[in-house]
Amino acid sequence: MTIPKFKNFNIEAYKPGKSKIKKLKKIIKLSANESALGMSPRAKKIISDKKLKLERYPDGKSELLRREISKKYKCNSNKIICGAGSDEVIQMICQLYLNPKDEVIVPQYSFLMYRIYANIVGAKVVFAKELKFKISVSEIINKVTKKTKIVFLANPNNPTGTYLTKKELLELRKKLNKNILLVVDDAYAEYMKNKDYKSGLDLFKN
């Protein structure tokens, strides 16, 4: 019997942060973007409703969910993609936009899944140096080549906690070639109260 060989991706595995620390019982972990409050009691009540028929496959297009999201954020539902967490959306972006030998720029310290999914499709990951643990617009622009297809960044950034201002983010978009996709990960936007900050959603949804 011939056993098929696995394809050797030669990529690093995702390494999650610590969830437990010795001698500490009550820990609020922010790095995984998990709710420290747990599930909403209202959500629990709705899920327990037998009329929902959760044993059936859901709508693959998530039309109802996208419609409700579009109402809340005042944007076109046709511009909304739903996924099983940001991981799946990042994976879809890489599969749709990247070919082998294309280049993807990511900050020096950033969410590992950007580089993992880019590597899986055969793209080259290029790291832009951070200055004092802050994403640098000039360093990203300096790394751009004719092969650059995507720039991934989280704003505010995980794990550094620093951020690009509204002015810096708009400057980056302006300086990038129009053919380069700028992916702004807003996972931690709700923590930002600084007046000079604007989420990618607020800046680019239209």
Model-derived regions, located:
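PLP-dependent aminotransferase-like
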Residues: L96-L153, K174
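Active-site pre-lysine segment of PLP-dependent enzymes
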Residues: I135-K146, P159-L182, D186-N206
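N-terminal "arm"/small-domain region of PLP-dependent enzymes with the aminotransferase-like
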Residues: M1-R56
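Phosphate-binding glycine-rich loop
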Residues: E63-E103
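Short glycine-rich anion-binding loops that position phosphate/pyrophosphate groups of nucleotides
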Residues: N33-A36, S86-D87, F111, N155-T160, ...
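Hydrophobic "anchor" residues on beta-strands that sit immediately upstream
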Residues: K29, I150, L181-L182
